[in-house]
């Protein structure tokens, strides 16, 4: 069984809440096998940032993310994994191979800022720029350094999931591994063999069959050329297209 241990920042919840909800569903794997064990870590930064977005910017996605985190925490801590409202209306069973950790504020006091800077090896200029960061980003770095570098468990490797370019930059400067929601979703969907992965594989196979030429771009990625008359569209759900 593959294990994935994700530190989720505010942008991961705000822009990828639907993905996170799907990961938590017990019926994500069509053959019923447990191929994935998930651990989610929610830093203090994430909760504070989502609260700020909810009240100052009236962000609906931030509000929904906070509600979901609260439901998830209650369900995982009390063992009430049946009939958790993952979507807006539909009740789902929460997967049993899922752990949620909400950060204790005391952890931030245990990690000093000089400790965080000790993991930056890019020179004094980078350290100076880190020293000028807003407090909220320093708090996030403390959380990530603790989970990725200081926690006494070599068996677990934590990865920060973020959609924020600035967070990605400062994470790299402190040697904190990170990935995007799309990257995380692609890996988990493949392991769970869920519908989104199967549809993607089906579409890619169709493109390969109908392609007339293959080449590589400057980044080394494969490019498939097709005839205009044989345009392949992504699969869509059944139903009538809505028109105003």
UniProtKB/Swiss-Prot annotation:
It comes from the Eukaryota. The keyword DNA damage does not apply. It is found in: Cytoplasm. Disulfide bonds: none annotated. The keyword Thylakoid does not apply. Gene3D superfamilies: 5'-nuclease. Keywords: Cytoplasm, Nonsense-mediated mRNA decay. GO terms for biological process: nuclear-transcribed mRNA catabolic process, nonsense-mediated decay. GO terms for cellular component: cytoplasm. Involved in nonsense-mediated decay of mRNAs containing premature stop codons. This is Nonsense-mediated decay protein 4. The lineage of its organism: Eukaryota, Fungi, Dikarya, Ascomycota, Saccharomycotina. The gene is NMD4.
